[in-house]
């Protein structure tokens, strides 16, 4: 869901209010609110700076035009300032384009094996490692919240939390929100003795994580909470206490498991955060579906998402079917070199949002 175009005057006023709020020591007694205000301020700061540059350039241009009336030597300066004003005006227009309100958010990412049995589970593990390597390249923190492994060490399913360590307007969600869907792999499985290429698939789901669980309405009476013995790798070794937590949201049937934190309380807290992210995504996707049947097809669930990308090992090729992107550096992509692909997806998304505005 994108925000509508906002007028610059409204944003300038908001920026001034946020600046005052950040200077108030009382704000910092609430870390979550301070982080929200800080992120919003960081989002508006470049817009305000560009507006100030544009205003200054327009003033200089007006002065140069007055001078050129009596002195032709200022003609070149007028031309340069006209170009500068046009450039800054285009930048500001782009900054004011509709924007995903979750772009600064951290994420919860789930990887699930699909058709293809053991090979699919191994590919799901490859995808999880790819995202972990990408996060490491950007200095983000990755926590494995839950994992179910296959016989050969693949992932039947895994849940990761990926968090930025900085309050920036372009957070983890802004880069990784396009990963939800079905990912297909074409390669010779390790279980294939004849050397034949097989096709299998794995699913990825991505949710923006709310700043606080309280942002999403969750009724305690709607929850069933079970505790059991952890079976995951969990930090520095296998957790042998009954600290794993499974939360079932009865109205929707959503089940969230967390077992890799060190205590039952920590696992419950993380499971509630994941549940809040999934409920928030469900509510927003339903709103999109209600607003537009065309947008409903983009709902991020593995069962209903169409194939978004193919990883072809024999040809060392990756193809993103949504935008026709192709590259022959599959080995680098699986090592977390995803920025070129994500830049292309972001550019296509920006064009789409501009058309809708």
Swiss-Prot record:
GO terms for cellular component: cytoplasm. The keyword Acetylation applies. Pfam families: PCRF, RF-1. It comes from the Bacteria. GO terms for molecular function: translation release factor activity, codon specific. The keyword Protease does not apply. Its main location: cytoplasm. Belongs to the prokaryotic/mitochondrial release factor family. This is Peptide chain release factor 1. The lineage of its organism: Bacteria, Bacillati, Actinomycetota, Actinomycetes, Mycobacteriales.
């Amino acid at each position: 869901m994108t925000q509508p175009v906002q007028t610059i005057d409204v944003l300038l006023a908001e920026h001034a209010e946020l600046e005052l709020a950040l200077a108030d020591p009382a704000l910092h007694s609430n870390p979550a609110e301070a982080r929200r205000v800080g992120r919003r301020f960081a989002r508006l700061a470049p817009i305000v700076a560009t507006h100030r540059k544009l205003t200054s350039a327009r003033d200089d241009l007006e002065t140069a035009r007055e001078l050129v009336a009596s002195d032709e030597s200022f003609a070149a300066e007028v031309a340069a300032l006209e170009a500068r004003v046009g450039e800054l005006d285009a930048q500001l227009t782009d900054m004011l384009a509709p924007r995903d309100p979750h772009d600064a958010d951290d994420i919860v990412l789930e990887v699930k094996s699909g058709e293809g049995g053991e090979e699919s589970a191994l590919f799901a593990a490859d995808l999880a490692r790819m995202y972990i390597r990408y996060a490491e390249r950007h200095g983000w923190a990755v926590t494995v919240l839950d994992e179910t492994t296959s016989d050969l060490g693949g992932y039947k399913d895994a849940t990761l939390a990926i968090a930025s360590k900085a309050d920036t307007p372009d957070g983890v969600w802004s880069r990784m929100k396009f990963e939800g869907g079905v990912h297909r792999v074409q390669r010779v499985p390790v279980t294939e003795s004849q050397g034949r290429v097989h096709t299998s698939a794995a699913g990825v789901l991505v949710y923006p994580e709310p700043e606080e669980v309280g942002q999403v309405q969750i009724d305690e009476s709607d929850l069933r909470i079970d505790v059991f013995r952890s079976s995951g790798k969990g930090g520095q070794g296998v957790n042998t206490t009954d600290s794993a937590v499974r939360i079932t949201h009865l109205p929707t049937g959503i089940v969230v498991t967390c077992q890799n934190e060190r205590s039952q309380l920590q696992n419950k807290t993380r499971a509630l955060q994941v549940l809040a992210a999934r409920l928030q995504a469900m509510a927003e996707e339903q709103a999109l579906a209600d607003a537009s049947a065309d947008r409903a097809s983009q709902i991020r669930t593995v069962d209903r998402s169409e194939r978004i990308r193919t990883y072809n090992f024999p040809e060392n090729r990756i193809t993103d079917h949504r935008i026709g992107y192709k590259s022959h550096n599959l080995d680098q992509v699986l090592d977390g070199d995803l920025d070129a692909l994500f830049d292309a997806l972001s550019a296509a998304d920006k064009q789409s949002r501009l058309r809708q505005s």
